[in-house]
Amino acid sequence: MSLVNTSWLEENLDKVKIIDCSWHMPQTERNGFNEYKNKHIKNAIFFDLDKNSKKDTDLPHMLTDAKSWENIVSNMGIKNDDQIVIYDNSDVISSCRCWYNFIYFGHNPELVHVLDGGLKKWIEEDRATTSDIIKIIPSSYTV
């Protein structure tokens, strides 16, 4: 797994696709999407781990099929050659699950990174956050 540090991401904010994949255990009564809407790294897109997983199973967060993955990623505006940085704001390291999905479906591993320390470290270092939601222009991602 390729980690990037907060300094690197801050210098490259406009050169990479940033994904917030925060997910919390139900008993925490926290909601990753609501937290994303209130505070996230500039240009981040939210990845809903529940909605973007296989639906016809009792097991949580199983990989979806390739066609569904293409639709999910295309609707996030991500292209096959995009460099991606994934982070979370949770105690369950949900960013790693999102990373695994991209690797499993063939995104170049050299282009998929996880932010070391996640949003927690970003905030601790007093780096800028926003509540602005970016306008996504869909792409044509293929597996």
Residue spans for each PLM region:
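Anionic group-transfer/hydrolysis microenvironments
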Residues: S22, D50, S90
